[in-house]
């Protein structure tokens, strides 16, 4: 009787874990849907087609993705924290706005290079060019291709957060990447970012490590600036 009771408890626990796993999977799917926008074009021949997806890497999306990976790989808290730190560092989230773009091109060959003149992010009626992007996006292709594109998070002159008080942002791709199937119309994706708060990601050990990295970068920049000023002063004195 006792063995049977224990078996029932174990089965109940297992079913609970499975239920939680599926619930989390559904939650990630819902989060992904919220932050992924798509556009699909069908050619006049009704056969050729182009689908473009763009995923805005919001705090909600990143947190849900990390949680999904942690559960799928059965990571410890330390392993999850390490992955989060590396993931955030790779995304350059403290400096830039990352957007993942996916193409599934079953139409004309696409020519997208140089990609930094093909894309722009509009924030408060001002357009910003990519500051970095996956260079594979420069090459012509048919079929599937994807890559991350990074836009500035702070004003270059004032250092102000460009997303402060902003409700929406719009990613626009020029029609030149696929002029025939888009009929010369730009491709646009709009996100509501009013409730996005990347600072939520920087908590606990992750926050401490990121802050240390930031300070080290700052010190390195100060050293570089000092060296440049000393070189200028020396040039003046030697003149």
Language model: regions and residue ranges:
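Bacterial N-terminal signal peptides
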Residues: 9-18
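Bacterial N-terminal signal peptides that target proteins for export
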Residues: 1-10
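Conserved functional micro-motifs across diverse proteins
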Residues: 24-239
């Amino acid at each position: 009787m006792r063995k049977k009771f224990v078996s029932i408890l174990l089965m109940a626990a297992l079913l609970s874990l499975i239920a939680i796993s599926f619930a989390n999977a559904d939650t990630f799917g819902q989060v992904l849907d919220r932050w992924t926008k798509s556009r699909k074009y069908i050619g006049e021949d009704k056969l050729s087609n182009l689908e473009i997806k763009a995923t805005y890497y919001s705090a909600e999306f990143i947190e849900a993705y990390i949680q999904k990976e942690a559960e799928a790989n059965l990571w410890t808290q330390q392993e999850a924290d390490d992955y989060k730190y590396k993931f955030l560092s790779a995304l350059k989230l403290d400096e830039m706005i990352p957007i993942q773009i996916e193409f599934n091109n079953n139409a004309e060959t696409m020519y997208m290079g140089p990609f930094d003149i093909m894309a722009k992010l509009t924030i408060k009626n001002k357009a910003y060019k990519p500051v970095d992007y996956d260079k594979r996006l420069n090459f012509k292709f048919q079929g599937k291709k994807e890559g991350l594109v990074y836009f500035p998070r702070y004003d270059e002159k004032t250092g102000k957060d460009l997303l402060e008080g902003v409700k929406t942002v719009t990613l626009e791709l020029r029609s030149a990447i696929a002029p025939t199937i888009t009929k010369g119309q730009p491709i646009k994706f709009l996100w509501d970012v009013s409730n996005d708060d990347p600072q939520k990601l920087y908590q606990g050990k992750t926050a401490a490590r990121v802050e240390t990295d930031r300070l080290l970068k700052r010190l390195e920049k100060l050293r570089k600036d000092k060296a440049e000023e000393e070189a200028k002063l020396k040039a003046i004195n030697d003149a």
